[in-house]
Amino acid sequence: MVLKTVRRQPIYYKANRFAVIGADDDVIWPSYSKMLDFELEWGCYIGRPGKDISKDAARDHILGYTIFNDISARDAQGREMGGQLGPAKGKDFDTANVMGPCLVTPDELGDPYDLDMTVRVNGKEFGRGNTGEMLWTFDDVIAHVSQSETLHPGEFLGSGTVGNGSGLERLEFLKPNDVIELEVAKIGVLRTKVTKP
């Protein structure tokens, strides 16, 4: 059911814009979770406003690209998804959205869909992928999201998790004090430490 829907159109959720942190900031473990996970993603920032943007014009609205670690409380997410309304507390807590280490403009990046991606936990490679593995390009996503809805400068769109880019796939979750490094060619390394109060 989910795969059929995802192949038919881009699926997305809107994250808490107040829960964003940057490179080298600590992720604070949410009190209600025992299964914290990372997601190897990248994303784009909107630079020009627009509504009903065509796929052909979408790239003109992209200001730049960065790396995105979509931290997820998998136990909470698992309970919520049965309600078929998307993630809530599984992805909505302070420090859940890690972005950085910089913003790379489209002219600096060149082809955005041929960049190698790697995730390391405590210095050990966990998984790798390529930006070209996206089912829907950012052009597709912008065209879809902007239907009858204005996109504003500063809005951020994530790619979705790259294959082998999360612990969920291997049922290996984070531990307190783990250090996660997400690397995307031509963008850099996004480093984050997990702390538990």
Residue ranges and their predicted role:
Residues M1-E125, T195-P197:
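Active-site microenvironments in enzyme catalytic cores
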